From Swiss-Prot:
Cited PANTHER family: GROWTH-REGULATING FACTOR 11, GROWTH-REGULATING FACTOR 5
Biased composition (Low complexity): 22-43
Gene that encodes the chain: GRF10
Protein name per its UniProtKB record: GRF-interacting factor 10
Native source species: Zea mays (Maize)
Composition skew (Basic and acidic residues), residue ranges: 47-69, 243-253
Cellular-component GO terms for this entry: nucleus
Assembly mode: Interacts with GIF1.
Chief site of localization: nucleus
Length: 269
C-alpha cells in the first residue's frame, strides 16, 4: 500500500530529489469566490461607464438649453443701461461705512440698538433717500411723517419749515390728514360731490369758489330824479336832487297826520 501511494504521488515524499518534476507541476486552480468577485467588478465598471455617458449626454442638452435662455435673458440694450453717478456711489458707500461703524460700536449684550419705532422711522428715511438718489419726486405719504416729527419736536419747527421744502404750492394742509388730490378745488357739498376745477396758485379753491360764502359789501347807489320824457328836459343836477330829498325828510310826521286827517273833518261837518 505504501509503495502504491509513493508511485502515484512521488512528490509527496522525497520531492526535493527531482527539481524538474516540481517545475512541471500544474498551478492550482483559482477559487470560485475570486472569479465571482472579478465578474462583479467588471459589471460595476461597465455600469459606471454607462452612467457617465448618460450624464454627458444630459449635460450637453442642458448646456444648449442654458445657452438659449442666456440669449433670451441676458441680452440688454446698452442705451437703456443707467450710468451710475460717481458722487452718488461715493455718498452711498460712505453711508454704508457709517452704519457699519455704528453697528460695530455697540458692545455685545447691550441689547437692541434701536426701538421698534426708531427702526420704522429709519426704514422710512432710507426709502426717502432712495427716491432722492434716483432723482425721482418723493411721494407725499413718505414726507408727511418726517415733517410732522420735525415740527412736533419743538415749537420753532413749524416756523423753520413752514412750507415743507416748497410743497406749499400744492395747497396741502399739513396740520390735518394729507390731501389725496393736491391741486384740486376743495369745495364740496359735505357728502360725495367735490369741485373738479383746479385751484388758484397758493390757494385752496378755484376762481368760482374763491369768494363763496364771504359777505360782500353792499354798494349804495343814489337814485336821481327821472327826467320827463315828454318835455325832454335834462335831468336835474345831483346836488339839487339831494337837496329835495333832504326837504322831504325834514317834514315831521305830525304834519303828515294832519294832511291825512283833514278830509275826514270836512266830511263830518
Amino acid at each position: 500500500m505504501t509503495a502504491e501511494g509513493e508511485a502515484k504521488n512521488p512528490s509527496a515524499g522525497g520531492g526535493g530529489d527531482n527539481p524538474q518534476h516540481q517545475q512541471a507541476a500544474p498551478a492550482p486552480a483559482p477559487a470560485q469566490g475570486e472569479v465571482a468577485q472579478e465578474a462583479a467588478v467588471q459589471g460595476t465598471g461597465q455600469e459606471q461607464e454607462r452612467d457617465k455617458a448618460d450624464r454627458e449626454v444630459q449635460g450637453g442638452a442642458g448646456e444648449k438649453d442654458d445657452g438659449a435662455c442666456r440669449d433670451l435673458v441676458l441680452v440688454e440694450d446698452p442705451e437703456v443701461l443707467a450710468v451710475e453717478d460717481p458722487e452718488e456711489a461715493a455718498a452711498t458707500a460712505a453711508l454704508q461705512e457709517e452704519m457699519k461703524a455704528l453697528v460695530a460700536s455697540i458692545p455685545d449684550g447691550a441689547g437692541a440698538a434701536f426701538t421698534a419705532m426708531q427702526l420704522q422711522e429709519l426704514e422710512q428715511q432710507s426709502r426717502v433717500y432712495q427716491y432722492m438718489a434716483a432723482r425721482v419726486p418723493v411721494p407725499t405719504h413718505l414726507v408727511f411723517p418726517v415733517w410732522k416729527s420735525v415740527t412736533g419736536a419743538s415749537s420753532e419747527g413749524a416756523q423753520k419749515y413752514p412750507t415743507l421744502m416748497g410743497l406749499a404750492t400744492l395747497c396741502l394742509d399739513f396740520g390735518k390728514n394729507p390731501e389725496p388730490e393736491p391741486g384740486r378745488c376743495r369745495r364740496t357739498d359735505g357728502k360725495k360731490w367735490r369741485c373738479w376745477r383746479n385751484t388758484i396758485p397758493n390757494e385752496k379753491y378755484c376762481e368760482r369758489h374763491m369768494h363763496r360764502g364771504r359777505k360782500r359789501p353792499v354798494q349804495v347807489f343814489l337814485e336821481d330824479d327821472e327826467p320827463d320824457s315828454a318835455s325832454g328836459s335834462k335831468p336835474a343836477a345831483p346836488g339839487k336832487a339831494t337837496e329835495g330829498a333832504k326837504k322831504a325828510d325834514d317834514k315831521s310826521p305830525s304834519s303828515k297826520k294832519l294832511a291825512v286827517a283833514a278830509p275826514a273833518a270836512v266830511q263830518s261837518t
